A protein has these predicted regions:
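Protein kinase glycine-rich loop
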Residues: 1-5, 10
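Conserved short submotifs of the Hanks-type protein kinase catalytic core
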Residues: 66-81
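Activation segment signature within eukaryotic-like protein kinase domains
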Residues: 100-101
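Protein kinase catalytic-loop region centered on the HRD/HxD motif
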Residues: 105-116
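Activation segment of protein kinases
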Residues: 130-169, 173
Length: 284
């Protein structure tokens, strides 16, 4: 076993046609849970609809005999969960954040083009290989079609406890979640990668819930006292974190492109400044 969560365990396995795969198995205690099974099969359904180099490919799904275990075989992705990598290394270099965000944005845009909102974007649902700098988006288990009616959405008690810090405010107020919600989540991921902290610092889920609905996020330049970002970088991040979906960028790839441009422009400026300082002090 290479990983486990509340609903499933993940194993490294050999597939007869596809070689090494990640085999995700629904926990036995949940095989009679209709919501858990529906969510598990939904991951396979939506995963097969999004074909993109930055989305983990779904290879096979099924059940091991009548009444058996539900399983999902997906592409084996190199690297590690972005959450773990970022917790060890954040704040990450701006060029690295630009590479990560543009790949996630491109993958999510592909999902949106296929009529799917991911709804659970967070570093824990992203694989990242620091050697190749490749990103792979995971877990469409709570994704929804953009035309899904509110009474058809799958919910579960406690869902927001685990992912509340990355969820868009409109998702908390019962609105039908649109692609703009994924943009908000990606902006939160970018904020975390750049600073090592989050735009809201609540001590409890209840407090976080209240802050998300009623308070503005902490400005990027106030996240860490030793970090300073150019005004354009902060402006892009804060627009992505706007409370109202209509105040964000038109689509997620526009946000990702603007942030990449701002981060790389800042990096060039920083490099020039450092070069001048080294020359001033006679360093090579």
């Amino acid at each position: 076993m290479v990983g486990e969560g509340g609903t499933s365990a993940v194993y490294r396995a050999d597939h007869p046609q596809h070689g090494v795969v990640a085999l995700k198995v629904l926990r036995e205690k949940l095989r009679q849970d209709r919501t858990a099974v529906a969510r598990f099969t939904r991951e396979a359904k939506f995963g097969t609809r999004v074909e993109h180099p930055n989305v983990v490919r779904t290879i096979e799904t099924g059940e091991s005999g009548p009444g058996g275990l539900h399983y999902l075989a997906i592409e084996w992705a190199a690297g590690e969960i972005l959450e773990r990598y970022a917790k060890r290394n954040a704040p990450l270099p701006r060029e690295e954040v630009a590479r990560i965000v543009i790949q996630i944005g491109d993958a999510v845009q592909a999902a949106h083009s296929a009529g799917i909102v991911h709804r659970d974007l967070k570093p824990d649902n992203v694989m990242y290989d620091p050697e190749s700098h490749q990103v792979k988006l995971l877990d469409f288990g709570i994704a929804a079609a953009t035309d899904t009616a509110p009474d058809e959405r799958l919910t579960r008690a406690g869902f927001f406890v685990g992912t509340l810090m990355y969820v868009a405010p409109e998702a908390l107020s019962g609105e039908l979640v649109t692609p703009a919600a994924d943009q908000y989540s990606l902006a939160t991921i970018a904020y975390f990668l750049l600073t090592g902290s989050l735009p809201y610092l609540a001590k409890t889920p209840r407090e976080m819930f209240t802050q998300l609905l009623s308070q503005p996020p902490i400005p990027l330049n106030r996240a860490r006292p030793n970090l300073v970002f150019g005004p354009q970088v902060e402006a892009v991040i804060m627009r992505g974190l706007a409370k109202q979906p209509s105040d964000r960028y038109p689509d997620v790839i526009s946000f990702a492109n603007e942030l990449r441009k701002a981060l790389l422009a800042t990096s060039v400026e920083d490099t020039g400044f450092l070069a001048k300082m080294k020359g001033l002090f006679g360093k090579k």
